[in-house]
Amino acid sequence: MKNRLLNICILCMVFPFFLQAADTHSVYNLRCEQEENPLGIETGQPCFSWQIQAQQRNFEQSAWQILVADSPEKLQAGNGNIWDSGKTLSSASILVPFKGKELKAGQTYYWKVRSWDKEDSPSRWSCIHTFGMGLLSEKDWSNAKWIALEKDRKDEIVTIGLHGLANVDRELKGKKIGMYRLPQFRKEFTVQKPVKRATAYVSGLGHFDMFLNGEKVGNNFLDPGWTKYDKCALYVTFDLSGQLKQGGNAIGVMLGNGFFNIPRERYFKLLASYGAPRLLMKIQIEYADGSTQDIVTGTDWKTTESPVTYSSIYGGEDYDATKEQTGWMQPGFDDRTWNKALDTGWKTRLLSQRSAPLTVRDRIPTVRLFKTRKGQWVYDLGQNFSGIIRLSLHSKDTHPVKLYPAELLNPDSTVNQSASGAPFWFGYTPKGKGIESWQPQFTYYGFRYVQVEGAVPAGQPNPDGLPEITEITGLHTCYSAEDVGSFHCSKPLFNQTYELIYLSLIH
């Protein structure tokens, strides 16, 4: 009996390996338009790619079959109602074009693939993957409007991009442009049924941060990408399915200027203003019962001035924490003092942002703290990088703090911004209620050093009772495309050369 039981146990352990051995190969790492489960696809003929894992060497694919369906249930049942390629004799596995029915705007599609080896043995079907279509025409936006806090000042519209002080002075004389207030928007809505999928299509110009029920949507930085805005603007697609809740929900959006509106203040490499910062959004909710609901931007949205009091892609960013309104991103907030959003009437061509977003890649701690001959405190982060800072401080009042980033130092150890453009600074006005933390949202700079004005490092003499800084950390922001390879060898010089090239590419 014991021997029989032992044999059964051995068979149970070994049997899966026999099953695995029967599979000559498998399909994995599926990609659509070179992304895993992408959103915002606009081409009517997306391309599919996959990789093959085989047990034998010199494997060669002899054929493939792709199924595409408009529901996972159909695909699971083997029904490719959008495309069934049939067994296609081909060794191709990279950028295989879709050749099925017309793809619809805003629709999510499901696909899988299998392949045959040169002995005509098929693999098992791959796991199911998805791709989501973007909004393909103006009508797909369901009458969403570009909304703003302020009207455009028509006599200040500059879309050609003025380079250099001489050109700016000649064209604008003493006129300041781009001095619009930075807005934040909110909209509440109700979800009353189980949600199958929810997708947001968002363009906030120059840049936006979006929040749902108080939580930031995505980890993107400086969305959307830069364009010639009177020719086209990019929108970004987000899957909100896991963030919506039954009952009341609230959307909040903050805008920065970016290249859409460059104020004629501080440093500017070029000057342009397409008008007041503005927002366009459509949220498409698909319910489990097959019904749908659209939430779109319009004059029923509420808006007010945000705590971001200055935003320039070239000159920096200021934030006044005393202007924060607790709970404004949450449902139930009292927004009766807010304004109705303005319909700008503006139009431009809209394209889906298909590149990987900028994100925070690394946190870079302070490695050295020193005082200049003039008495300013300087934080040395140990390496040059592009990005922003993370500031934490303790304050008993609202004394403003300025942080000057720079790549270089002057002979007297003060920061030198000549290599990157001056003047540039991050400004923060605390609430004055203890520990506070902040990081800029709509600008970036290349720097290693941070010089402080209006605060002192914690633990240092502070006879004037200034805010005390407990942390300055660098946040390295860069392109977030995944690494697909690396290099390392026994020669330190080659490794260092590779590292320099790598850092240059991702900055």
Tell where the protein language model's regions lie, with residue ranges.
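Bacterial Sec-dependent N-terminal signal peptides
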Residues: 1-26
